[in-house]
Amino acid sequence: MNNFSIISAYKPAGGQPKAIDEIIAGLNSKKRSQMLLGITGSGKTFTMANIIERTNRPTLIMAHNKTLAAQIYLEMKSIFPKNAVEYFVSYYDYYQPEAYIVRTDTFIEKDSSINEQIDLMRHSATRSLLERRDVIVIASVSCIYGLGAPDLYYQMTVHLELGQSYPRDKLLNDLINLQYKRNDIGFERGCFRVKGDHIDIFPSHYSDKAWRLSFFGNELEYIHEFDPLTGEKLTQLDKAMVFGNSHFVMPQKTINNAISSIEVELQKHLDVLKSQDKLIEAKRLNQRTQYDLEMLTETGSCKGIENYSRFFTGRNAGEPPPTLFEYLPKDALLFLDESHVSIPQIRAMYNSDRARKEVLVEHGFRLPSALDNRPLKFEEWEKFRPQTVFVSATPGPFELEETGGTVVELIIRPTGLLDPECIIKPATNQVEDLISEIQTTITKGLRILVTTLTKKMAEDLTSYLQDLQYKTYYLHSNIHTLERIEILRDLRQGNIDILVGINLLREGIDIPECGLVAILDADKEGFLRSEVSLIQTIGRAARNSRGKVILYADKMTKSIDKAVSETLRRRQIQQEYNKKYGIIPKTINSAIHTLESLEEIHDNKLDKKQTNTLLNNPAKLKSYMDKLKKEMFKAASNLEFEQAAKLRNQLKTLEKAVLELS
């Protein structure tokens, strides 16, 4: 059995050793739920890594969005280089679900763009879970959506072993049943090709490795792993396992049974629609479903096959769909990061999906069984989740109820950094006072974050500060994700001194250069000025030893009182620790990632300006990457392997940039 092995120059420090011991003790005593209260800069990811290493259990880490999931994935990948660290998020770059607008009688067809790199990583994740135990999967909350059943996914594999007999026609047919395509010219992921007594397979979970099978008659003599671009042999294998090119592959018998069940449901629902005098809806449903049935019969797949998933998995109406949780071993461990945000998201996902599909069913676009192609209900997720550690600086009511209010605190930072000093000032003339504070902070070479209550106030304040010649930017919800990260990078580099926002300056923003966080109208109770929001916003100044927070308020609200009191409590604990061990607080100097640092873009004749333009325009990016891919294969076919390798590196650079900046 493979063991987890941390490769790091650091050892647990600060509050980490105590937190690790307490969480592990709780796991060993079979506690189903624990709460890790980890503040900004305390080393939550490293703490989770040490818990994983010591318990040696397969682990799922859930984050509330792709950006945070990618951040954790990259960190875990560097901590566990010898183990399987996987990334499982939605593979759509763009997704428009099918919908029907009754008021205008408008049907919106499903439209999507699949990210091949993320699809590859999803296949790699499920494969690792089925083949080994030293696996850490970092997923977004979208992992509670339906996925192909693990038993069917594993059943639909081709096992290859040296010395065994594989009739050629049967092997090729098996690969086609796994939805691999034969392509003797353009060899890419999810394809196979045949040359004499060789069969080359490009597995769905690899981007830069393929397998060459060499036969003597029907006997498998060699399995070589090779570079599909240059043809260079990498290693020799004794055996290999080919998984499906889709999570929805299934045996022909299952497809035939499903077709029969779909036909039965179709007839029943047509009778229902006709009894309601919905003749147009009945005709529409019959046409759409019959077309899907023909495609399933002829090809084993159809567009929107996931809407019939209940029939393929053998589940009854209303039963939960198979998800990533069914791929987890029974002794798996779950970390739910930023649980105060993730829990409400999990609660909401089912209802929003259900409302859209009920309209489709009612108007004859889908069968009622489409309602079972859905995310898990919260109660189902609660049932399926394994032993869980909730992780948050501000635990929500669900986590506290589940853990009986008991939390494991991780509030001592190894760096000695204190929680920022919180100063409360009158909201009257808050802008004039803010300008004075801004000037003082900029003089120190530090940056400023300002959070307002309304969009109009943020816009007006930004314009006002810009008129005063301050380098100010307004961070709002309409800004594209990649542009948002560029803005934050400009802030860290000093191209921007002040960032103004509403609800965007909370979880996951790492700005060690931040010396001041100003919270305007802090006494206006509500979502944006709740205890949780205030603590999260205050935390943005916790990565700099000179960081401070000013709350502009004319009255003391319960939220301000609790947030400031909690910050003061944490500050005092850190001060005592620093005094005891003679630690001088040091600002966290994390690297400012530039596009050049992702890979040597200039070596491939793609400058930063070009890269930024591409990354901020998904359509152009996809077109450019498709062009690069064609040029790469053309160079390889012309035996220009050096040029092909350069083009491949450039493709990898862009793919990695998209992942890190997504």
From Swiss-Prot:
Domain UVR: 622-657
Subcellular location: Cytoplasm
Matching Gene3D superfamilies: P-loop containing nucleotide triphosphate hydrolases, UVR domain
Main location: cytoplasm
UniProt: ATP binding residues: 38-45
GO biological process: nucleotide-excision repair; SOS response
Keywords: ATP-binding, Cytoplasm, DNA damage, DNA excision, DNA repair, Excision nuclease, Nucleotide-binding, SOS response
Domain Helicase ATP-binding: 25-414
SUPFAM superfamilies: C-terminal UvrC-binding domain of UvrB, P-loop containing nucleoside triphosphate hydrolases
Matching CDD domains: DEXHc_UvrB, SF2_C_UvrB
Cited Pfam families: Helicase_C, ResIII, UVR, UvrB, UvrB_inter
GO MF term set: ATP binding; ATP hydrolysis activity; DNA binding; excinuclease ABC activity
GO CC terms: cytoplasm; excinuclease repair complex
Organism domain of life: Bacteria
Ranges for domain Helicase C-terminal: 430-592
Short sequence motif named Beta-hairpin, residue ranges: 91-114
SMART domains referenced in this protein's UniProt entry, alphabetically: DEXDc (SM00487), HELICc (SM00490)
Function: The UvrABC repair system catalyzes the recognition and processing of DNA lesions. A damage recognition complex composed of 2 UvrA and 2 UvrB subunits scans DNA for abnormalities. Upon binding of the UvrA(2)B(2) complex to a putative damaged site, the DNA wraps around one UvrB monomer. DNA wrap is dependent on ATP binding by UvrB and probably causes local melting of the DNA helix, facilitating insertion of UvrB beta-hairpin between the DNA strands. Then UvrB probes one DNA strand for the presence of a lesion.
Family that this chain belongs to: Belongs to the UvrB family.
Domain comment quoted from the record: The beta-hairpin motif is involved in DNA binding.
Subunit-level organization: Forms a heterotetramer with UvrA during the search for lesions. Interacts with UvrC in an incision complex.
Listed HAMAP family: UvrB (MF_00204)
Descriptive protein name: UvrABC system protein B
